[in-house]
Amino acid sequence: MNTVIETNIFSAKAAKVWTPKQYEDFVVYIASTPNAGEVVPGSSGVRKIRWGKDGAGKRGGVRVIYFNSAAKETWLLTMYAKNERENIPAHELKKIKEAING
């Protein structure tokens, strides 16, 4: 099981979208299945997973962007609703990951 770490951006967005129970369910799931999401091509291993929210299934839910470090940490970078934006460009995700890894 991975340790889950979240950025301030992710925390703020999750608080607006999920109930505490939905948040807890996601964190438990991603900690135990860190490779569940698809690797975003060209992002150096950043992953995207679809997750439902109240009143919407996965298709109408959110996309969570994260990556797994070699230290068995899962970093939750950001999240967005599909109706907000389709995708985040891979080069932006790569920059975020590099900033966290130093």
Give the residues covered by each predicted segment.
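Short, surface-exposed coil-to-beta transition loops
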Residues: R59-V64
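Arg/Lys-rich, positively charged N-terminal/basic patches that mediate binding to nucleic acids
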Residues: M1-K21
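Short, charge- and proline-biased low-complexity linear segments
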Residues: P20-A36, E84-A90, K95
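Enriched for short, Lys/Arg-rich terminal
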Residues: F67-G102
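Anionic group-transfer/hydrolysis microenvironments
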Residues: N8, R50, Y80
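A short, surface-exposed loop/turn module that caps and links secondary-structure elements
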Residues: V28-K58
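Residues that recognize and position ribonucleotide moieties
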Residues: T3, R47, E86
